[in-house]
Amino acid sequence: MKKKYICSLLFFATICCFSISCDHGIEPKPILKSPPGFSGTIRFVSEWPDSVKRSFIVVFKNPLFTPADFTIENLKFLSREILLGVQMHDFSSLDSAYIPATPGPFPSGSYAYVAVVQQSTENLSLARKDWFVSGVYYANGDTTKPGTMVIPDSTFVKNINITVDFSNPPPQPPGGN
C-alpha cells in the first residue's frame, strides 16, 4: 500500500512539474506588421546643375564632425541612384540599395545624419571629397542642425522628408570640397 501511495505521489509530482515548466512550447516569433525602416520624399525645388552625374540618399549612424567621421563603418545606408532631373523622389529603406547590399528590415536605433548627396565623378566614389551635400533631413522643422532619425524597435518610420535647393545648399560636413 505504501509503495502504491509513493508511486502515485511521484507520478502526481512529475505531472505537476511538467505542467508548471511547460508554457506555450516552441512558439514562433510574432509577425511584424511592417519591417523596421524608414521612408520619405525628396523635393527638388531648383534646377539641377549640369555637373551632377549621380545623386543618392545617405544615412550615417554618428555625426559628421570631422573628416575622420566619414567612414564606411559609419555609413549605414547608400541608396541606389536617384534619377537625374526629377522634381520629386519617394524612397524607402526597403528598396534596393548599395549599402546595405540586400533589401530588408533596417536596424532600429538613432541615426545622426540623413542627406541627399551628389557626385560629379564619372564612377561611384566613396571618397568624401567627391560628395556634395545638397539636402539634409531636419527634424521638426529645425533647420539649424541636421535632424536625428530615430527608428524604434519593430517600427517603420515615415516622413523622413528632405528638400533640395541647389541654389541654397546646406552647410557641408568637414572634408568636402
Q: Where do the language-model regions lie?
A:
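Bacterial Sec-dependent N-terminal signal peptides
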Residues: 2-5, 16-45, 166, 170-177
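Hydrophobic helical h-region of N-terminal Sec-dependent signal peptides
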Residues: 10-15
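Surface-exposed coil/turn segments at beta-strand junctions on protein surfaces, enriched
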Residues: 33, 84, 106-108, 152-155
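Tryptophan-paired
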Residues: 65-109
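A short, solvent-exposed beta-strand micro-motif common in secreted/extracellular proteins
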Residues: 102-126
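Structured interaction patches on ligand/partner-binding surfaces of diverse proteins
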Residues: 120-168
